[in-house]
Each structure stands twice: as C-alpha cells, then as structure tokens.
Amino acid sequence: MMDIHQILKLLPHRYPFLLVDRVVELERGERIQAIKNVTINEPFFTGHFPNRPVMPGVLMLEALAQAAGLLSFDMMGEAPGDDKVFYFVGIDGARFKRPVEPGDQLILDVKLDRIKGGIYKFGGVARVGDSVACEAEIMCTMRTVA
C-alpha cells in the first residue's frame, strides 16, 4: 500500500529515527497497518541491552506515532512541507506486554478515534505475530512552523 519511498515523502524522520518500513493497509481517515522490521543493526541495541537486546518501549510508541502521522497526512490528502509538522503531544494508557527482539517484525495497528480542537487521538497496538507488544492512546497535533 505504501513503500519506503512514499513514507519518506510523508514523514520528516530519517535514520536512525525512521521507525516505519512499509504500510500494508490503509483506510483513509480510519486506520493504518504498518510494519517495522527490527534487526540487530538497530543503533539502540548497542546499549539496550548488550547481552540481551530489547527494543526500548518508548521507540515502540514512537513507531505507533509515526504510523499515526502517516494516517493523518494521507487523510488530509497533502504532503507535509517545511511549514507543517505533526507533533506527538500526549500518551495515555501505555502498556508493554512483551519484549521486541532482533528478528521480530513489529506490526503497527493505529486507528483514528477522534479529532477535537486540533488534537488527533488515536488508539495504537504494536504486535509481533498475534502477541501484543505494546498498546497506547496517542495524541498528536499539526502545527504550522516558520
């Protein structure tokens, strides 16, 4: 549905902070499913943890937020410019259920719950196979920057 080249046009993130590799499903204004292929080459594994590498939970949340950003830009039907940025403004109910290790494929399911007062609220679940790795409610807003 969306390859890395299309993702790079919509997200400002770059290595080592781009955490979405592909979009596999997208229902405009409703939901998105994306993937992050987790490899031993991720820079965070050097220190988290050297003898038992585990993806930091906060980066799983960031991957969900990036998927939410892709859903939002697609919903608006426009690509971001230098003057528009989506900011991650809040999170509720974050829960971590299982570790994510090198070789795992993180499946990111995000649905838009509502838009109110310029705040977009999403429900997100990150899975490895059928096993939930983390879940949270994510809030973002778009801002025009100079």
UniProtKB/Swiss-Prot annotation:
Q: Which InterPro entries does this UniProt record tie to the protein?
A: FabA_FabZ (IPR013114), FabZ (IPR010084), HotDog_dom_sf (IPR029069)
Top-level taxon: Bacteria
Q: Which residues form the active site?
A: H48
* Gene Ontology CC terms, in alphabetical order: cytoplasm; membrane
- Any one Gene Ontology molecular-function term assigned to this protein's record: (3R)-hydroxyacyl-[acyl-carrier-protein] dehydratase activity
Keyword terms of this UniProt record: Cytoplasm, Lipid A biosynthesis, Lipid biosynthesis, Lipid metabolism, Lyase
A GO BP entry is:
lipid A biosynthetic process
- Enumerate the catalysed reactions: a (3R)-hydroxyacyl-[ACP] = a (2E)-enoyl-[ACP] + H2O
Top-level class of the enzyme under EC nomenclature: lyase
The EC number(s) given in the record are 4.2.1.59
Q: Where in the cell is it found?
A: Cytoplasm
Short name of one Pfam family for this protein?
FabA
Q: Which family does it belong to?
A: Belongs to the thioester dehydratase family. FabZ subfamily.
Q: Name the job this protein performs.
A: Involved in unsaturated fatty acids biosynthesis. Catalyzes the dehydration of short chain beta-hydroxyacyl-ACPs and long chain saturated and unsaturated beta-hydroxyacyl-ACPs.
Q: Which PANTHER family match?
A: 3-HYDROXYACYL-[ACYL-CARRIER-PROTEIN] DEHYDRATASE (PTHR30272:SF1)
Q: Indicate what this protein is called per its UniProt record.
A: 3-hydroxyacyl-[acyl-carrier-protein] dehydratase FabZ
Q: Which gene holds the coding sequence for this protein? A: fabZ
